């Protein structure tokens, strides 16, 4: 069934507008907002679903509400951050007549402060995720620029051993310093596996169901 003429004309007008270069910066901001919202849902919804049903107590309704709230918060913040970042990038480029490396840092600095500056569980997870990747990237950049000498051996095994040694030491003796979701995961792995009563909570369930 063919679309009505009015709808076809509207779609043609919209597509013509989208192809005009003079509106590209503004349209990129809008699409960035869209992509941020979609990516936030893709990343947070599965994570919240798994973590909530594994570690959170409460009714099914409470669990679903927690999943929806976490997904909405992540999606909204990421969408607004992309919108803010691309808007500030475009503004700086327009004012200074070109792009500079510092523009990216300043735009993201302001956007990060505004959208991810609140100290909560979701922002903490996002920032820690980025911290590890930024440190890796800076080390690689340092090697590329010659500030850090390139090693003749692969440091990855040593790095892995140190990280795993530290995280288990922190979990066993300084647990409050670890992020809550990491504490929950490690408790499930290393402490809950020390307790069982019969076959049901040895192989089938993690913990025995309360008797009625």
UniProtKB/Swiss-Prot annotation:
Q: Which GO terms describe its biological process?
A: ether lipid metabolic process
Give the record's membrane topology. Answer: Multi-pass membrane protein
Keyword list (alphabetical) reads: Glycoprotein, Membrane, Peroxisome, Transmembrane, Transmembrane helix
Tissue localization of expression is: Liver.
Q: Its GO CC terms?
A: peroxisomal membrane
Annotated membrane-spanning segments are 97-117, 151-171
Q: Which InterPro entries match?
A: Pmp4
Q: Which residues are glycosylated?
A: 206
* Subcellular location field: Peroxisome membrane
The similarity annotation says:
Belongs to the peroxisomal membrane protein PXMP2/4 family.
The subunit structure is:
Interacts with PEX19.
- What is the protein named? Peroxisomal membrane protein 4
Species annotation: Rattus norvegicus
């Amino acid at each position: 069934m063919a679309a009505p003429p009015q709808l076809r004309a509207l779609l043609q007008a919209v597509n013509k507008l989208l192809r005009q270069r003079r509106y590209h910066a503004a349209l990129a901001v809008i699409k960035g907002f869209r992509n941020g919202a979609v990516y936030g849902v893709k990343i947070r919804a599965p994570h919240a679903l798994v973590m909530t049903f594994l570690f959170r107590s409460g009714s099914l309704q409470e669990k679903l509400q927690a999943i929806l709230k976490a997904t909405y918060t992540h999606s909204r913040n990421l969408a607004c951050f992309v919108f803010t970042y691309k808007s500030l990038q475009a503004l700086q480029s327009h004012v200074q007549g070109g792009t500079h490396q510092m523009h990216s840092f300043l735009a993201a600095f302001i956007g990060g402060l505004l959208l991810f500056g609140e100290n909560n569980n979701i922002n903490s997870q996002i920032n820690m995720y980025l911290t590890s990747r930024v440190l890796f990237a800076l080390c690689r950049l340092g090697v590329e620029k010659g500030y850090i000498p390139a090693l003749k051996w692969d440091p990855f095994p040593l790095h892995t051993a140190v990280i795993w040694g530290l995280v288990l030491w922190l979990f066993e003796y300084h647990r409050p310093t670890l992020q809550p979701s990491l504490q929950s995961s490690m408790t499930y792995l290393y402490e809950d596996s020390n307790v069982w009563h019969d076959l049901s909570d040895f192989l089938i369930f993690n913990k025995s169901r309360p008797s009625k």
